Amino acid sequence: MAMVKMIAFVKRKAGLSREDFRRLWVEEHTQLSKVLGMKGYRINIALEPQPGENEPPYDGTAEIWWEDIESMQAALASPQNELAAADVARFADVLHFVYTEEFVVL
């Protein structure tokens, strides 16, 4: 059975350094999120642009997955998720979400 996944595209808050963005998200915010019944949680932080390249449109992505859609819906409707969602405002200005069904190929 395929896992249900939420993929978040995140732009850091204006004026926030890359280091503070990483710390607030990876070290602090994840502590609020760990109790949402998820089966996995991956954060990907964008690297500094190479010389001659533009800034990426997002500073990072998160992949969070659950066993099934009911588990995801219960987690997203929980009071704990309300706290986690409010905490995001400390480090992010822009969030876009895509909800997917994962198919592992390799």
Task: Kindly label every feature range from the protein language model.
Residues 2-106:
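Macromolecular interaction modules
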